[in-house]
Amino acid sequence: TSLWSAGFLPGIHQGTQFRAQGDPVLFLSNPPGVQPSDRQRQLSALRSLNDLRARQTLDPAAAVRSSQYDLALRMQSSVPELLALNEESQHTLTQYGASAGQPSFAANCLLARRMIERGVRTVELFDADWDHHASIHTALPRKCREVDRPIAALIRDLRQRGLLQDTLILWISEFGRTPLQQGGTAATAGRDHHKDAFTMWLAGAGVRPGMSLGATDDFGMDIAERPVHVHDLQATVLHLLGLNHEQLTWRYQGRDFRLTDVHGQLLHEILL
């Protein structure tokens, strides 16, 4: 849950997880026999109790609960419409490689576009099965085919709808893979985790297109030119969001924190 938690921010900024199977958002539907009017009365009573608790304890979590319940109530009507991918044209579904009612990374990319259209500020997509310690020669091409088409469709779709200029896209993982074979024969071998050199890409708002920054050695083992630390990336993303990473602080457990700690330099080369 830390991947979409509010972190240092107030709990109202906590992300909402959408699931690929079953109810897309847990506990969003009313239990059997509970009418919308019943739920309204329940929430009104809860709001009174939470407000009383917040005044008594000055606990930020108590103050946030009412807002979270109100958000859940609004989502009961908005989420079904949001998830109705069958409203999209067949041309759009084909562009993404998605099928209505079938969970996939392609469907998630299309869902991301629908969220952005409706004003959702941050969307995070996850894709699994990239940990190729074995059979990388067959597994990696398969994974690339699964993601390449919908990613391209998402960028193209956002541009055509005039949304890309205000949307920052980051494609990123927590590490790369070693350039050396790991285990097995040539046919079944994989690659191990590699934190010392890996790539990511950005597109959209404020990012210079059609360029690369930095390079590895010929083996892909070490950074050979223009190393970029994660704090540099964080500083640049905050800049694109209109925030100065050196001035943005949050008081937590008695001291002020910066999201970039005491580090971070803007990547001016990639900025428009």
What does each of the following model-derived ranges do?
Residues 1-272:
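Ligand-binding pockets and gating/stacking loops
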